[in-house]
Amino acid sequence: VPLDGFPVSNGHGRVSGGGDPVSRQSNLVIETAHPYTESELRQMLIKEAKKQGKEYGYYFNAVTSGFTYTGEGGSLNSFNVTPLEVYRVYVDGRPDELVRGVDMIGTPLSMFSNITAAGDQPAVFTGMCGAESGWVPVTACSPMIYVSQVETQRRTQSRDLPPVLPAPDVNTSTGGDGDEAIFGAMDEELRRNMAGLSLPGEAKPYYLSYVLTRYRQWQIAGSLGGIFYSTVTPWQSSGGVQVMLGNYQHNSDIQYMGQVAPVQLPAELDGYNIRRGFWETSDLMYRFSLQVMARKIAHLKSNPLPPAEAALPDMQQLPAVTKMVERPRPFEIDLVALEGMVKELSALFKDYKELFNSNVMLVAVEQDNFRLTSENVRLKFPLGLVGLTVSASVRTTDGSTVSDVLAISSLENPVDLPSLEELKKKVTDFADNLMELKETPMIEEYYTGPVLFEEGAASRLFTDNLLSPGRLLALRTMTPARGMLDEQLGRKIMDSRLTVKNYTTLVEYDGTPLFGHYEIDGDGVVPA
C-alpha cells in the first residue's frame, strides 16, 4: 500500500501462513562508537542512582514476553516488557539482590532519549515475532545498554488465597519404589488432608478420592508408502481429586458424576511431586465443595425433593477393598516393524490414483491406573489400547467429495493386531468400496421398509438405542430432566422379544477377544 513519501515497496513485507504481508522487522544490530566494560557501566549506574537519591538501581539480566502499542487508532506508542531475572544493585556496596514482580513500561521516545552508554560485548537473541501477518523469525544483536531513567511498575498480584494446609515437605520419602511408592505418597497426602483440611468454622471432608494415571503413547502415520511422523512419548502422569463434604445422606455433590478436579503431575514421579499435586488440588476442591454445598442446601430448600427421593442417600458407602490387577501380557512395541506395516498398508493407495488424502495411522496407549479413597478402597488396574485407522477421500462424478474411514481398534495389545496379509485385504477392500462410491448415484426418494444391518451397523443400532442415558442407563440429577429413565417406570421401554444381559467379565465371545471386560469396577465393586 503506497504511503506519502513512499510510493513503492522497500521489500520489508513479511508473512507466514495465509495472511497478508505487513512491514516487519528482520535483523536488528545495535552498535556503539564508544563501548564500555560491564564494570564501567555498573559504576555509571551506581553513580546515577546516588545522584537521583536512590538506594539502588536495577539490573535486567533477562526478559521474556512483552507487548507494544504502535499508535493504531490514535493510541500512544508504548511498551510493556516482563523481565525474568532482575537484580537490585545497591549504591552502598551490598551484594546484588534478586527480585521478582517488576514490569518495565514506557514509550520508545523516553527510553531512547535516556540511553547513556553501551557495552563492549554484544549478545544475540533469535526468536519468533508474532503480528497480524503471522509468526516470522527475527534476530537482534545488542551490547549491554545503560539507561539513566526507566519507569517500572509492580506486577499485579494474584488474589489467590493461601492454601489451608502447608505444602508437603520437599524431602518427603515414602520408601519403596514403583507401585508401593505411588500408593505410599497418595496415602500420606490423603490422610493429612482428611485430618487437617478445614477452614475455621467449616466442616472437614468426610470423603476423599485420589486417582493417578501413568501412561505412554505411540503414534505412527503414513501415506503412499512413506512415514510422515512416528512419535513415542515418555511415561506421563495425570490425576484427579474428589472431595465430599457433609455425610453419605446429604453431601456436596451436585453432579452425581464427574465432580472431580484434574491433578497436574510431572513426568518424573517421586513422593514429593505426587503429594504436592494432590495437595494443591485437594485445597482447590475443598474450597469449591464449600461453595457447592451452600448452593445445594439453598436449592433444596426452595425446591424440595419428593419424599421417596429425599430418603435416598447422596452416596453409597463402599466396603474397604484392595485389588491389584496386573497386565496379563507385556505391552511391547516393535516400532520398526509397525512402521514397516504402516508403510506397506499406505502404499496400497498408489494403485488408486483417484483417491486422495489417504493415510494410515496406528495409535497405541499403555496405561496404569491407581485409585485410593478414604474408605480404604485401593485399586490398581492396567489398560491397553491399540487402534489402526485408514482413511481416504474420492471425488464423485457429480463433483462432491466422499470420505470414508476404516477403523480396526478395541485391541488390548499390539500382538492382537491381525496379520499383515489380513490387513492388506481389509485396506484393499476399503479402497475398492470407496472407488465404487465414486460412481454410485445419490438416493433421492424417501423410504420406509425392510433394512438389513450387519457388523458394526448392527451393534451400533443397539448401543445407541439401549445403552444411553434415558434408555437402560439411569442417572441421578439435581433437577428433573426430560427423557430420563425414571419417567418411564411402569411403561414399556423395549421389545419383549429382546433379552439384555451384561457380560462384564466375559473375555472372549465366539473366538473374538472382548475389549470391555473387567473383574472389578473403578469403585472396587465386583460386577453383578
PLM region spans:
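Long, low-charge, small-residue-enriched segments that form tightly packed helices used
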Residues: 1-172, 282, 523-528
